Amino acid sequence: MVVNSQAFLLALIALLATQLPSLMAADCPLDFSGSNFTLVATVCSNITNRGKCCRYMNAFVAVSVARYANLSTNLGVTSDLSETCIASISRAMEGYGVSRNATSFCGLGTKILVKYDCDGRTTVTQMHQSPGFGHVSRNCRLPFSPGHQCRKCLNSGITYLRNLIGAETNNITLCTCRDATYATLASRIDDTSALELLSCFFQVTELNIPSESFSPVASPEPSPSTVGGISPSNSDSQMTTSRSTNPYHLTMVPTIGIVVTAVALTMLVVLVILIRRKNRELDESESLDRKSTKSVPSSLPVFKIHEDDSSSAFRKFSYKEMTNATNDFNTVIGQGGFGTVYKAEFNDGLIAAVKKMNKVSEQAEQDFCREIGLLAKLHHRNLVALKGFCINKKERFLVYDYMKNGSLKDHLHAIGKPPPSWGTRMKIAIDVANALEYLHFYCDPPLCHRDIKSSNILLDENFVAKLSDFGLAHSSRDGSVCFEPVNTDIRGTPGYVDPEYVVTQELTEKSDVYSYGVVLLELITGRRAVDEGRNLVEMSQRFLLAKSKHLELVDPRIKDSINDAGGKQLDAVVTVVRLCTEKEGRSRPSIKQVLRLLCESCDPVHSAFAKAVEEEIGWDSRKRSNLRIQRGDSRIFGPSSSTTSRSHYSRSLPHSPINGFSF
């Protein structure tokens, strides 16, 4: 950031140094000799004559362009001098008493131009060569005879322009082409004829100027509003044709130089202040990083996460690393209630997802470090791995694995993406159930997720589902899991929230089971949890209860792919949905029971294998006695395998299996 600012500063100074001479030497080449600006001021002083005011203003600019075309064959000045001429004309008119409101209303610089471009024609030669212009030249031959000669000229010009640029052209283009036509005709005639033609084209009068006004007249004092020789006089507007002796330009050159230099110095001071402030912020951030690292438990910076065949170090990132990896936080890939997620590419090649926490409480660094210490020890193939964290003043950042295929929500509901197959959906359902089983049964103390939804289920490059945002339960000082008091706001997403939790505000693992059931129903139907303003669970009740209507629940995009075997699997999965979404938590199965039934529905061999393993270990035999699987159309669960111990501030789920991960 500092290097970029310094480079920008040097480039700015170099640009100003190269542009300063051109700014000081800039001059408008248009000749306004004999232009009666006093007449313009008189006409424009009457607000009822706005149209006439604009015609006079336009006429004087057009005759000056015609004179310039006589010398250069160009219909106006070059682009780099256009703004200079407009500014000079505006100042000159103000010197004669024409108000800024008048020049603004008439569009000096936007409608009244000093550079004519008529459908790509910018020179006298191009206009003469355009089709139909010869007819205009013949009808506008001067001097005009008494009668309808002017009208004949105008009608010829109108016909020419309509054929040239079309009848539907906007007014600005039409006016520009009219001015270009006049300038082309007037560029090859004398001043008297040019003024006569001007009166016809713009319907203006009183333009006759005494011949002596065209001779050089010395101005006794510098005028504050001269343009190419324009200076107010006591009798009439008279102009000197020699710009080299114009005192106005001699006084403007140092003025412009002083202004540009002052602006450059001001910008230099501002940039120096900004650079010093940024340096100070970065120094403070690095100092804070060093300080907070001392408060992090010693196990955190060197904690290793071993998952399958990969390993990576959990570490603390500096704020500078965060800003560089996210391009100053300009790589947003997602946003939710708990923070904004950015894609980050670190210098060591690590590609990660960085979550900036939205709601940061007045939480001590040690408390935050203890919580991320808890999260860092959660490692499972179906949980998004936490790679590290960052603390910057009151800002908190969490660094996770980057999931290439986005969220389940994107694949189910995004327009233009192919829908996941039935097999892929069931695989995702089992992956999520595995993650929840780990949180509920294999952590010590057990954890609840609290916000299971399709957008929190991420997919890696192989479409392995991983649960994210599982850090919503906080660790207390004694190591137990803490939740907010009863009067806290309800957390979760509409459509996924356990209705029992909404009433009691007491969180249990059965709340996760309910949310999982909604996700499972979302996988079956391909519809959102709240669809068309209605709750998906309530909307699906009549299909859940009748086996004959199970197939009607299926996403229409994949319904044809479900065969007889898939139909039996569908019946089992629908039964799981119905049981998971029971209104009372005690009527719902545990996630372990859900996982077993899903695995059996996908692979019948799994049932015998699971039974053999359980008999071998022995610890789960009492749970199986509580699970009643009836033959027929549906499976009914008995009492849950886990009893919930409820507390406002802490809770733990009993029956954590032996060899469960402890921290």
UniProtKB/Swiss-Prot annotation:
It catalyses: L-seryl-[protein] + ATP = O-phospho-L-seryl-[protein] + ADP + H(+); L-threonyl-[protein] + ATP = O-phospho-L-threonyl-[protein] + ADP + H(+). Residues 640-652 have a biased composition (Low complexity). It is a single-pass type I membrane protein. Coiled coil: none annotated. The active site is at 451 (proton acceptor). Keywords: ATP-binding, Cell membrane, Glycoprotein, Kinase, Membrane, Nucleotide-binding, Serine/threonine-protein kinase, Signal, Transferase, Transmembrane, Transmembrane helix. Glycans are attached at residues 36, 46, 70, 101, 171. It holds the Pfam family Pkinase. Gene3D superfamilies: Phosphorylase Kinase, domain 1, Transferase(Phosphotransferase) domain 1. It is found in: Cell membrane. Residues 224-243 have a biased composition (Polar residues). It is an enzyme of class 2 (transferase). SUPFAM superfamilies: Protein kinase-like (PK-like) (SSF56112). It comes from the Eukaryota. Residues 1-25 form the signal peptide. The chain crosses the membrane at residues 255-275. Residues 26-254 are extracellular. Residues 327-609 form the Protein kinase domain. Residues 276-663 are cytoplasmic. Belongs to the protein kinase superfamily. Ser/Thr protein kinase family. This is Probable receptor-like protein kinase At1g49730. It comes from Arabidopsis thaliana. The lineage of its organism: Eukaryota, Viridiplantae, Streptophyta, Embryophyta, Tracheophyta.
